[in-house]
Amino acid sequence: MKRLSIPQIVMMHSALIKETGGLDGIRDENLLDSAVNAPFQTFGGEYVYKTLEAKAARLGYSLVKNHPFVDGNKRIGMLAMLVFLEINGIELTCSEQDIIENLIG
């Protein structure tokens, strides 16, 4: 399974902010580290998030809730989740509106 690294997510965030607007920068490096590694937590030698989809959901959720960046946390949470799925061979076929409603709603 391929993982996204912290430097990759920071680069994605900077590109996203440049394209969509907002303030670039990390607000809390520890919260970023926590968010990026949360999908790979183990308990008793077993992954807490067993499926690729569960890991992707946890990555997106953690980036949104931990708020590690100054701005654009919801945007990077969704983008990181989609990229994580894609690099692992899963491409979503939902509409942009579905994504927005599920992320914000």
Where are the predicted features?
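FIC/Doc superfamily catalytic core
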Residues: 1-105
